[in-house]
Swiss-Prot record:
Keyword Lipid biosynthesis: no
Gene: asp3
Consequence of gene loss (knockout): No effect on cell growth, significantly reduces export of the cell wall protein SraP. The small amount that is exported seems to be glycosylated normally.
Highest taxon of source: Bacteria
Coiled-coil zones: none
Function, in words: Part of the accessory SecA2/SecY2 system specifically required to export SraP, a serine-rich repeat cell wall protein encoded upstream in the same operon.
Source organism: Staphylococcus aureus (strain NCTC 8325 / PS 47)
NCBIfam families: acc_sec_asp3
Taxonomic lineage of the native organism: Bacteria, Bacillati, Bacillota, Bacilli, Bacillales
Family, per entry: Belongs to the accessory Sec system protein Asp3 family.
Keywords from the UniProt entry: Protein transport, Translocation, Transport
Subunit composition and interactions: Part of the accessory SecA2/SecY2 protein translocation apparatus required to export cell wall protein SraP.
UniProt protein name: Accessory Sec system protein Asp3
Pfam families in the record: Sec-ASP3
Amino acid sequence: MLKNKTFKVTWNYISQTTFMYGSKVSFSNGEVTFINPLMPSGLPIHEWLMLKQFSKYKSAPSLPILRRGQHYKLHFDFDATPAGSVYFIIIFYNKNGTKLSTEIVKSNSITIQYPDEAYAYKIKMMNAASTSLIFRCLTITEMTHQYDLEYKSMRVTKIGDDQYGNDMINVIIAEPSDTYPTISNDFLKLFGHVWLVERWMDDNIEGNIKQLKNDLQSQDTLKAINLISYGSKSNVFATYVAQHLGCKVYRTSHEDDDLKGWLTEHVPGNHELKDTNVEVYFKEEQDKHLNYMSRLMNPVRFLDYLDVSKLNGGEVNET
């Protein structure tokens, strides 16, 4: 399989599109630090352009030329304080400079199709009450294969957002599997306000950890977050995310040593993790099928051992 073409876009200097009123901007080791706690929300911090008039901007275009009708995956590598306080806008223009369409990106990644009528585009990095920002790069990857066009990035299904005053959330980390069906919505409703996180191993695990962490931290009304897992890989992932968030994790005793070692080696900040409140609701020695047959059975069955009433403050959602 041919490797997809990837363009790396960086922020190399202060330009006319950089918001500089009261801002402190520094460039070091491939990172840009932007600090301005007084910057109004809704204004662009910086812009990247595909077309520029050199006489006006005194610099070359910073975005690659994209092919019409082609699919691309864009990934934004950055950290904002507070979490969720920076987002991106992709604006497409036709030949006469009229705005054609707009994409608003509030996560780290998005897959787009470059419009057939588009002549140019630009990307704005927007402020939403951010006090500081560390920006590393933007990557634009051309999706050239059918597998890529059906790209399976991390998926978060949200159910029952209005349950329990919206101040408590149960986040179920699905065990990766191409064999077993996904957890049904009817089963998920037992957990009240619940997010189901799937396909977190299909792409950039480090990026998925960061995205999930940011998404949860942006839920300002939450008083409690419970992470729930039920398999060897999901247990490792859930425990790691819970350590970043300082929240409670409910898991089984199963653990994938290879994944645990990989996270320790490849994901930054492993040595700075917070203590996690871990409750093991099922231990491996309890498994009546503890033999080669156990590996053939859907591990979601272990969730039957979890006392759901503990998760929702003593309540069980029976609707």
